[in-house]
Regions:
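Secretory-pathway/luminal and periplasmic proteins that interact with or process carbohydrate-rich
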Residues: 22-25, 89-97, 191-198
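Transmembrane beta-barrel domains of outer membrane proteins
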Residues: 4, 67-69, 171-173, 250-252
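Extracytoplasmic gating/loop element in the C-terminal half of outer-membrane beta-barrel translocons
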Residues: 81-177, 183, 209-233
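Residues that define the transmembrane beta-barrel architecture of outer-membrane proteins
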Residues: 58-62, 162-166, 241-245
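Flexible, surface-exposed loop regions and adjacent strand-edge segments
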Residues: 29-40, 97-105, 199-209
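C-terminal beta-signal and terminal closure region of outer-membrane beta-barrel proteins
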Residues: 196-253
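Gram-negative outer-membrane beta-barrel transporters
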Residues: 1-75, 81-90
């Protein structure tokens, strides 16, 4: 969906919404077959192609644009342009797999976890006595896991939280002489984070392999859980959550 309008005074406004429900049988970027096998999340047989959520794209995405130019000077040959872009989106699909090879397919990375009920946790064999309670608490604070107790996690069925970001651009164009002009620009990416360090932050999964598993000679699993794992999401501290500024200078002739 998209709506846009240019007003008589030169103001341009645009707003749009995209919805995506994409599925595939393999979302892994792999140059060799072994990686495609080892990293593609599965329930049982990695050689069996199963249609499931694709990891790519945002499920919901709202965008908005506002731009305005002012012409002035002799013969209105100088132009100042100010524009902004805003995005609000929910995407970042991910899944939960065991830290271990529970299905004996040779990969410790691709086995989707079973989300146990409270009573089932009490019947599981854990490596330490506190693991059961810590796993119970972790499941209960996670909306996706809590909603799928007694079922397996879906391939890329979980979504990261909503994120919002605004970019701002300033352009000053100066005409120097016939067919010659100088343009100076400033881009501020994630402008909200410049105004407030708590704005424009992106959250990411804290751990996508929350449950460890080892199989003994008799085929019985022993589970483990990291006691330091309290919450599903943490803030991404890289540049994606930080404001950035860049300058541009262009001479046209």
């Amino acid at each position: 969906l998209k709506a846009q309008k240019t007003f008589d005074n030169g103001l341009y406004l645009m707003a749009a919404y995209n919805f995506l429900d994409s599925k595939d049988v393999n979302s892994i970027e792999a140059e060799i077959t072994g990686d495609a096998f080892a990293f593609n999340p599965v329930l049982s047989n990695a050689n069996s192609a199963t249609l499931a959520h694709s990891k790519y794209g945002d499920r919901h995405r709202f965008i908005a644009v506002a731009a305005k130019s002012w012409n002035y000077g002799a013969n209105k040959e100088w132009t100042t342009t100010l524009s902004s872009f805003y995005e609000l989106a929910q995407g970042g699909r991910f899944n939960y797999t065991y830290a271990g090879d529970i299905n004996n397919d040779g990969s410790n990375l691709n086995d989707l976890i079973y989300i146990p009920t409270t009573s089932e946790i009490g019947q599981m064999d854990f490596s330490t006595a506190t693991d059961a309670g810590n796993l119970e608490n972790f499941i209960n604070q996670d909306d996706y896991l809590k909603g799928r107790r007694g079922q397996y996690a879906e391939r890329y069925g979980a979504l990261t939280p909503w994120r919002g970001k605004m970019d701002v651009k300033f352009i000053q164009n100066l005409k120097i002489k016939d067919n010659n002009s100088l343009e100076f620009s400033i881009d501020i990416l994630n402008f909200g984070n410049l105004l407030n360090s708590d704005w424009g932050l992106v959250q990411q999964p804290n751990a996508v392999q929350p449950i460890g598993v080892s199989i003994d000679a008799g085929g019985s699993p022993t589970y483990s859980f990291n006691s330091n794992l309290k919450e599903t999401f943490v803030y991404n501290s890289t540049l994606i959550s930080r404001w950035q500024m860049q300058f541009g200078l262009r001479y046209s002739f």
